[in-house]
Regions:
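Blade-loop segments of beta-propeller domains
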Residues: 53-89, 98
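Conserved beta-strand position repeated once per blade in WD40 beta-propeller domains
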Residues: 30, 70, 112-114
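Conserved beta-propeller blade signature
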Residues: 38-40, 78-81, 126-130
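Surface loop/turn motifs at the tips and blade-to-blade linkers of beta-strand repeat domains
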Residues: 20-24, 61-65, 102-108
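A short helix->beta-strand "capping" segment at the edge of beta-propeller domains
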Residues: 1-27, 53-57
Length: 150
C-alpha cells in the first residue's frame, strides 16, 4: 500500500511504497501518490505517465509528446509534471490521467528541472518548481494553479 508518512498537522515529505511491478518500464524519474492512493510514475524513456493502484496493479498510462521528469500532487489532487525538453509544466488529473493545462516557458535558455510539494493536512499545500533561466537557478511557487516567480 502506498502510504504518506505524516503526523496530523505536519508537512508530508515522502511515502513508503514496497511493491513489485510486472511492467516494462523505461526509466522512472518521478513518483507521487494521488488523494485516491493511486501511484503516478514518470517514465522518461517511454514518454509517458503510468498509473498504478495502491497494490501495484497497472491501471492506465498517458502518452506524452516528450519526456516527463518529475511529478508532485497538490492537496487539491492536481498533478504537476515537469517536461524539460519542452520547457513546460503539465497540470494533470492523476486519477483520470487527463491533461488539464500546459504552461510553456518561452525563454530559450530555460530548463525546468524538478517539482516538489510541501503539503499540510491543515492548510493548502504548496507546489514548487526548480528551473534554470539565463544561467541562474531559481524556484517558483505554484498557488491555485498559477506559477509565481519572485
Amino acid at each position: 500500500m502506498a502510504q504518506v508518512l505524516a503526523v496530523p498537522g505536519d508537512r508530508r515529505h515522502g511515502f513508503d511504497f514496497k511493491r513489485s511491478f510486472s511492467h516494462d518500464f523505461g526509466r522512472i524519474t518521478g513518483i507521487a501518490v494521488s488523494n485516491e492512493n493511486n501511484v503516478l510514475l514518470c517514465d522518461y524513456i517511454k514518454n509517458q505517465l503510468l498509473l498504478f493502484d495502491e497494490e501495484g496493479n497497472y491501471l492506465n498510462y498517458l502518452p506524452l509528446t516528450s519526456s516527463p521528469w518529475d511529478v508532485a500532487i497538490s492537496n487539491q489532487n492536481t498533478a504537476f509534471v515537469t517536461m524539460p525538453t519542452e520547457q513546460c509544466i503539465l497540470q494533470v488529473d492523476p486519477d483520470k490521467l487527463c491533461i488539464c493545462s500546459k504552461t510553456v516557458f518561452e525563454h530559450p535558455n530555460t530548463f525546468i528541472s524538478c517539482v516538489s510539494s510541501e503539503m499540510s493536512t491543515t492548510e493548502p499545500g504548496n507546489i514548487y518548481v526548480g528551473f534554470v533561466s539565463g544561467g541562474r537557478s531559481m524556484a517558483a511557487q505554484i498557488m491555485e494553479g498559477v506559477l509565481i516567480i519572485k
